[in-house]
Amino acid sequence: MNRSFHKSQTLRFYDCSAVEVKSKFGAEFRRFSLDRHKPGKFEDFYQLVVHTHHISNTEVTIGYADVHGDLLPINNDDNFCKAVSSANPLLRVFIQKREEADHYSFGAGTLSRKKKVLVTLRDDGLRRRPHLNISMPHDFRPVSSIIDVDILPETHRRVRLYRHGYEKPLGFYIRDGTSVRVTPHGLEKVPGIFISRMVPGGLAESTGLLAVNDEVLEVNGIEVAGKTLDQVTDMMIANSHNLIVTVKPANQRNNVVRSSRTSGSSVHSTDSTTSHHSLPGAHVLQNSEDVESDEEADIVIEGALEPQHIPKTQAVPPGSLSRANGTSLAHGLHRRDMSLHSSGRESNGSIHRFLSSLKPDPRHSLVLPQGGVEEHGPAITL
């Protein structure tokens, strides 16, 4: 091996115009230097290489490794000057016999395909490239999100738009118009701000959460009621990097249906309260048991009449009772009569007010089967 390595190292540090050349032919390495600004011609470089390796009588091909690790040929003045100018800081030259040379080995990515050449070109630090993970991306940047779903009404929607610092516009236009509000005095028309147009391919259209004719209610927590169109526009521009818009969608069918804790319970409680105070027999008569229906009928009748008529209900012949509703009716009437005397004194006033509406014809409130108590029951007897 040539011992001029230390000399070339000195040239590299003290002479910035010198380019160190490391040539390889087979298992031999040679080192020499060239002038970066005046490298000369390719013929002179060719003669220098073959003279340095003592192969003057052999036809060879010369190639070099560029900064990207690709093996490129040196066969004219242009690519020779390019090779010298791109050397940083070392120009690696490879020499092969022409009959043994593979001309298809030159080109981009050739050194990465030839393992033996790669080992000779690079040291350990450059040879071990990190493996490129070409797969589905793991870190997605959010474009939009729906927030405050729990605290907003179902007819409203709060959308957050993310721009991530790039110059892509928000992608929608707004206009002023007239909206209808429910006030204590009725429906009133008030000024409102609406989305007039969506820019195709814009940020707002790509989210799918905003649409034309959606009414803008708030911008970053500030209500737009009472503000002009220019003021709302300035508010959106000032908060465009993190815009939070509360809208009332024009198409309410796309809203998320949530289970309301107040609406569902209030409906059920109202229904149950009304059923107890309006018509006690209405809910019971929908069932298939006639005994409960007759018991409820006794409550209505006995609450409106005098107590001395109650024993007549018990004096009905057992045959007629069994023919109407069975033998269990007598026991049900007896239990209901005992509970009526205790509860009638407490709610006597409310029962009388309710029964006043049923006095004209109690048959209409009692849906009884044909051939039942209608003939022998207490409703006809009393």
Swiss-Prot record:
Instruction: Show the ranges annotated as biased composition (Low complexity).
Output: 254-278
Q: What is the similarity comment for this entry?
A: Belongs to the PAR6 family.
- Every copy of the Pseudo-CRIB domain together lies at 134-151
Keyword set includes Cytoplasm: yes
Q: Supply one GO CC term from the record.
A: plasma membrane
- Domain PB1, which positions? 18-98
Record's subcellular location: Cytoplasm; Cell membrane; Cell junction, Tight junction
Task: Show the segment(s) annotated as Interaction with PRKCI and PRKCZ.
Answer: 1-115
Which terms under GO biological process does the entry name? cell division
Free-text note regarding domains: The pseudo-CRIB domain together with the PDZ domain is required for the interaction with Rho small GTPases.
The UniProt function text for this chain reads: Adapter protein involved in asymmetrical cell division and cell polarization processes. May play a role in the formation of epithelial tight junctions. The PARD6-PARD3 complex links GTP-bound Rho small GTPases to atypical protein kinase C proteins.
Ranges where the record places region Disordered: 254-295, 311-330
Protein's UniProt name: Partitioning defective 6 homolog gamma
* Tree of life domain: Eukaryota
Which Pfam family, any one of them, does this sequence belong to? PB1
What keywords tag this UniProt record? Cell cycle, Cell division, Cell junction, Cell membrane, Cytoplasm, Membrane, Tight junction
Subunit structure, interactors included: Interacts with PARD3. Interacts with GTP-bound forms of CDC42, RHOQ/TC10 and RAC1. Interacts with the N-terminal part of PRKCI and PRKCZ.
- Per the database record, which ranges form the PDZ domain? 158-251
Q: Which InterPro entries match?
A: PAR6_homolog, PB1-like, PB1_dom, PB1_Par6, PDZ, PDZ_sf
Q: Which Gene3D superfamilies match?
A: 2.30.42.10, Phosphatidylinositol 3-kinase Catalytic Subunit, Chain A, domain 1
* Xref: PROSITE patterns: PB1 (PS51745), PDZ (PS50106)
Query: Which species is this record about?
Result: Mus musculus (Mouse)
